[in-house]
Amino acid sequence: MAFQIPRGTQDILPGEVEKWQYVEKIARDICKRYNYHEIRTPIFEHTELFLRGVGDTTDIVQKEMYTFEDRAGRSMTLRPEGTAPVVRSFVENKMYGNPNQPIKLYYIGPMFRYERPQAGRFRQFVQFGVEAIGSNDPAIDAEVIAMAMELYRSLGLKKLRLVINSLGDVETRKAHRQALIDHFKSRIHELCEDCQVRLEKNPLRILDCKKDRDHELMATAPSILDYLNDESRHYFEKVKAYLTKLGIPFEVDPRLVRGLDYYHHTTFEIMSDAEGFGAITTLCGGGRYSGLVQEIGGPETPGIGFALSIERLLAALEAEGITLPISEGIDCYVVAVGEKAKDESILLVHKLRKAGIVADKDYQDRKIKAQLKSADRLNAKFVAILGDDELAKEVINIKEMSTGEQTEVPLHSVVDYLKERLS
């Protein structure tokens, strides 16, 4: 039987994985500059965590989670997103007691959602996200948004659009919720079944419906911005002022929502406007939450974060025709001719590697011509040719592949010679 990977997953092969490594390195470097620290949580958690932390009325919980019972009969779920596990760890490890608030965390790892595979969407995907937990300052909202924008800009993406909104506070959402119910209830039968359920459970999520987004009721729905109280309006104005101060352009879209009750104030998405990117234009989404920490068992603690898919980021780079500066090839390929030279080549390659030189050699006992072809295929910068005669004289021939220039070097100084030539 020939096995194939499960639908909605992918193998990331050599030659492609270097792009992932490059993007992840840039993300880690940015996090370090912003003083965010990596956190690693399990890829599966108790299902109840996501029922509470993601919301039992969301599509993720109702339709997309990979849930199973372990051998003790406990319900477990492969993590569909990163915020709930990070907040669970924040509470469980009592990070709220750390005097250096906010706690700034980031994560990179696989997430799992059972959804229809399509361009930019997989059932296993890699998510990069950050969480800043413990501050109510609108400046941290601007900082988090700036981090996401810096990642995309540093990779060369230009066709980006930042969309922001405010969900206000508890008072705002309560008033807006009633206005939405009044607006939709007389014609709710015109909308999809999901929206009909959402009307009573979570009417704000009707605005996020993909099926009915073009329905006239959506265009005329009450704007949450009209229900902001003075405090919420002031908070939103501060966030916008900080973004302007940082030189980050944005659009305000009152239909940009987060359906969970603990999301308050700032919410944002970063879109790609690149031609050929596909129907799914959202690259990154985030927002401020007040209540999630309490929901998961901790004290009242605010937070803000974002998450993005590495797969979708790479697709955006491709759509804009951006080639990442991936270094290909090796520094030195050791060609050995003769039994003694072959034995010595193992030690030589080991010395080169210990000195930080990327090196390889032949392991197929091939002729010199075939070994040189291997060096060429591996894009070796230099080839070190060692034969039994050279070994007897304690010398080695170094060939620079780009010029064909060949130099005889004392065997004891080959490491220093190559380090100097490669610097």
From Swiss-Prot:
Single GO molecular function: histidine-tRNA ligase activity
Signal peptide region: none
Catalysed reactions, as listed in the record: tRNA(His) + L-histidine + ATP = L-histidyl-tRNA(His) + AMP + diphosphate + H(+)
Single GO cellular component term: cytoplasm
Matches recorded under PROSITE patterns: AA_TRNA_LIGASE_II
Compartment(s) of residence: Cytoplasm
InterPro entries the UniProt entry points to: aa-tRNA-synth_II, aa-tRNA-synth_II/BPL/LPL, Anticodon-bd, Anticodon-bd_dom_sf, His-tRNA-ligase, HisRS-like_core, HisRS/HisZ, HisRS_anticodon
EC assignment: 6.1.1.21
Entry keyword set: Aminoacyl-tRNA synthetase, ATP-binding, Cytoplasm, Ligase, Nucleotide-binding, Protein biosynthesis
Example of a GO biological process term: histidyl-tRNA aminoacylation
Claim: Cell membrane is one of the keywords in the record: no
Protein name: Histidine--tRNA ligase
Encoding gene, per UniProt annotation: hisS
